[in-house]
Amino acid sequence: MFLTIALFLPSIVLSNAQELNLYTARHYSSDKEIYRIFTKQTGIKIREVTSKDQALLERLKSEGSASPADVIILADAARLWRAENLGFFQNLDSNKIFKTVPKQFQSNNKWIGLTTRARIIVVNKRRYPSKKIESYNDLANLEFKNQFCSRSSTHPYMLSLVSSMIINNGIENTKDWAKRVVLNQARTPRGGDTDQIRAVASGECGIALTNSYYLVRLMRSSNPRDRAIVKKVRFVMPNQKTTGTHINVTGGGVAKHSPNPKNAKLFLEFLISKKVQQLFAKGNNEWPIIKNIELENSKLTSLGKFRRDKLSMGEIGKNQFGAQKLLDSAGWK
């Protein structure tokens, strides 16, 4: 038993307390297996509250100082920044976390990234078999008129991408880009990322944006229809010659009023351990937050190595309101 514990939790002393309250926006069965391992190795039982990010934020606001939450996990830098701005995180106190997690994925000692994903472009192979597409800016090209599909402008995935563009390209250039992309839309924005991939495969759209793990999920699917979709599209890692592809995170921190802060810190340290980072990649097709982790996911590996944008997640998050205002002014629904 000790050897198993050492594998996952090097240099960590087991807590005497037996409970941890987790508020999480993640809903994957592979995560639950990770939680079971943590409980088995520490004796700390995880009480999980799972809901959408906004619902969790509303619940935390309603509960106030009486909240039982110990750890908060949210998807996307925009949502994490909102939680930080609302005062829902306390300061992290862990040298291990600060030494392990790259500074790009830390925010004011309040929260850290746990996994990463890329905002990639998917293209209909038949419609654009050899068209060279290199950047997010290319989405605004006139040749893609009535071809582009996307999520709603209010979705954090869109807000984070546009936030990064404002930082990298300036607000006026980004506003001009957004206006031209709106003119290229094939339909009113709707649906999730998987819906965009399906629309590109069907020919309803010629080109779209998606988070990388949605594509890998289809690549790994045992459903023949999903695999047929994958055969009809190709993907592009944008901005390889400039800033690098936009990266985002799922992240977490210790709740402001955590009744079990030691357990919360122990849990976050567990989530950034080498083995758990491998399990995240294997289970939900996300890249590890830490470097030099061997992936046990051939489809994720098949996306290849690529240049990543180096922007701080905290900086991306705090620009989201400006991004929303810009998209509204551009007419992006």
Language-model segments: which ranges?
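An extracytoplasmic/periplasmic, membrane-proximal ligand-sensing/linker region
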Residues: 173, 285-333
